[in-house]
């Protein structure tokens, strides 16, 4: 399958990337190759379409941007990889629920190969790691938008970041939800390494999905 993978400038402004995703999606045609954009954002809180302002508790000097993605509120910043997936789901023959599962399973697979056991949580999209006391902390978040069968936005995974800004919100709309990163799980790796691993895994899984459809499995 044809897939363009691009790294955006470090500290890319969320609003600029969002506008670029919308423009790409609006202009793409039936044969336009899918793309993956990888980046670390400058600090920003984003509110999804279902986002309630009361879940932004104390933004301090961090900007809050209302977005068209699904979900509630989250934080993006340095030390976190954001993977924007500009995929034609209609062309791939993929239902939204299967796409969400693909994103979650991609993060779980990459974390697993790094030695971190992660899991999905029923009713709460994203990827979680068990903490002492058997509580779950969120390590990866999802947010997607589908327009005319094409997806944009994607997933974020906390690599080695300052987690303090998550205390200024109810992450994903859940009061008291803990967050963690790969560094807190004892793993030292770069955002670039993790981003490339996620992109490679996404391409592999999307290709496998399309292959299973064409073979009638």
From Swiss-Prot:
Q: Which Pfam families match?
A: LplA-B_cat
| Principal subcellular localization | cytoplasm
Q: In which pathway does it act?
A: Protein modification; protein lipoylation via endogenous pathway; protein N(6)-(lipoyl)lysine from octanoyl-[acyl-carrier-protein]: step 1/2
State the EC number(s).
Answer: 2.3.1.181
Q: What enzyme class is recorded for this protein?
A: transferase
Q: Which residues form the active site?
A: 172 (acyl-thioester intermediate)
Gene Ontology terms, cellular component aspect?
cytoplasm
User: Locate the BPL/LPL catalytic domain: which residues?
Assistant: 30-210
Which residues of this UniProt protein bind substrate? Answer: 69-76, 141-143, 154-156
Q: Any extra remark in the record?
A: In the reaction, the free carboxyl group of octanoic acid is attached via an amide linkage to the epsilon-amino group of a specific lysine residue of lipoyl domains of lipoate-dependent enzymes.
- Name the job this protein performs: Catalyzes the transfer of endogenously produced octanoic acid from octanoyl-acyl-carrier-protein onto the lipoyl domains of lipoate-dependent enzymes. Lipoyl-ACP can also act as a substrate although octanoyl-ACP is likely to be the physiological substrate.
Q: What is this protein called?
A: Octanoyltransferase
Species of the source: Bordetella avium (strain 197N)
């Amino acid at each position: 399958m044809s897939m363009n993978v691009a790294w955006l400038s470090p500290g890319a402004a969320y609003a600029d990337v969002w506008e670029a995703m919308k423009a790409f999606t609006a202009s793409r045609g039936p044969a336009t190759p899918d793309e993956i954009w990888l980046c670390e954002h400058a600090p920003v809180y984003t509110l999804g379409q279902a986002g309630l302002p009361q879940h932004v508790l104390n933004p301090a000097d961090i900007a809050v941007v209302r977005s068209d993605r699904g979900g509630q509120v989250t934080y993006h910043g340095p030390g976190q990889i954001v993977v924007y997936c500009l995929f034609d789901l209609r062309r791939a023959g993929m239902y939204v629920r299967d796409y969400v599962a693909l994103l979650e399973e991609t993060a779980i697979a990459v974390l697993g190969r790094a030695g971190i056991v992660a899991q999905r949580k029923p009713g709460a999209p994203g990827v979680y790691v068990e903490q002492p006391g058997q509580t779950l902390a969120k390590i990866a978040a999802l947010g997607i938008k589908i327009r005319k069968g094409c997806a944009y936005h994607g997933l974020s995974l906390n690599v080695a970041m300052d987690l303090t800004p998550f205390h200024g919100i109810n992450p994903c709309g859940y009061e008291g939800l803990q967050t963690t990163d790969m560094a807190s799980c004892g793993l030292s790796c770069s955002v670039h390494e993790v981003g490339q691993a996620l992109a490679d895994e996404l391409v592999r899984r999307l290709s496998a999905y399309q292959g299973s459809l064409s073979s009638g499995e």
